[in-house]
Amino acid sequence: MNQEQVEKSKSVLGEDTVKMLLQVHEDAIWILGNLGIGCNNLEILKQFQILEEDNQAIVYENRIYIMPDLAERCLKTVPGIAEFFAPRNSFFIGGTAPYIYDDAAGEGGLSPSLGHMIRIAKTAEKSKVIAGMGKGVKLKNEILQMNIMAEYCGKPLYFNVNSDAAIENAKAIYAKRKNIMAMFNLTRSPLQVNENVSEYFVKAVKAGLPVFISAMPLAGVSAPYCYNGVLAMTHAEVLFGICTAQLLHPGITCIHAGYPTIADPRLDYHPNFGLISHNLANILMAHLNLMLDIPTCQSAGMTHEAKLTERSMADTRMGHALCLKYGFHIMRHSFGFLRYLTDFSFAKLDTDISIAETVTPADAPEVEMPVYDERGMASVRQTGANMYKEDSLTTVNLGKIFVS
């Protein structure tokens, strides 16, 4: 634990909220040891089976249970933030929209082209407020997309690597420049390895590529409906990825890219990325990782609007201002995205950049900092690795938190 950062976090978040975050870490460790992570990948299972003799892990019926000492040991071998190539308070273009929004016609659903990708990469390289980028949009050829990003943007990059050819291409890029990350959604919530990508995660780690480990538990669906509950589930899933990476390749760079997300009952329990609460939850996730001295990338500055509107601009300003007020390491999804990250709008990209150039911490709304809610872990113990939509905490908290 970085004690200097603990004190900094206390000064901006308050002592009770920092106490909550430290307990979130303990809760995540409990989840790994008592609920475990379902896994069918033989290589990953093997890494933990080796440790059963020393009581550092248990593998039972294709479920991995990680003991606290092992989790803490693995965290100690992760290179810290000072050794990482992206500075604090970095906003990234991130995410992977399947479509382009036609701002002139006022409709989405256009297929992204090479020209769109080049434009995004050039914009990221040129803008002083954009510190790095993910893909932004999805092209069918992931290798071509990686190469476009590397050619047109010299800033830190992250991209998915979902094939042997993509692994080899990422290795070739990494040999020339070290500021890239291989992104993996290693888990699918709640608490299950995503077998579609686990093979390539193992290969990327063995190749020494920095791994960007994402997880997206949804409060009220796949996680408890309170701040510390969804933070703990998010943290547990990413910690599993970090532990796996450190066992396969001790000392490899890991980026904690878990982003807690909130189901909105007004939207039939779909996520609402425009909530103040979404930004705050991700800022809190960032602070926990800053205190643990782990490179960290969350999600902020988004909107629930389906096109560029006054509300979408207000959402961008609110998210950026909150991040600047409280501090963070890296935030993604901060430029160009519309509702559900489905459409990417160039008009919104340009507007978001203009907002980021002028926004200040003084633009942030007042927020009530959360404190620890014991019912969050009570829900975890009761519901476990099942769905939380009918959980008693979800029903009692509807309309009381995550509402603005």
Language model features by range: what are they?
Residues 1-7, 11-27, 32-35, 40-47, ...:
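Catalytic-core signal marking the mid-to-C-terminal active-site face
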Residues 9-13, 267-273, 301-308, 336-348:
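Short beta-alpha connecting loops at secondary-structure transitions
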Residues 20, 27-29, 85-106, 292-303:
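N-terminal small/glycine-rich loop or linker at the start of catalytic domains
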Residues 38-45, 58-60, 249-255, 293-299, ...:
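Flexible, glycine/charged-enriched surface loops at secondary-structure junctions
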Residues 42-105:
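Glycine-rich, N-terminal phosphate-binding loop and its surrounding beta-alpha-beta segment
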Residues 44-51, 259-264, 301-308, 337-341, ...:
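A glycine-rich phosphate-binding loop feature that marks nucleotide/adenosyl-phosphate handling sites
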Residues 108-329:
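Helix-rich catalytic cores of soluble enzyme domains
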Residues 308-352, 356:
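Ligand/cofactor pocket segment of small-molecule handling proteins
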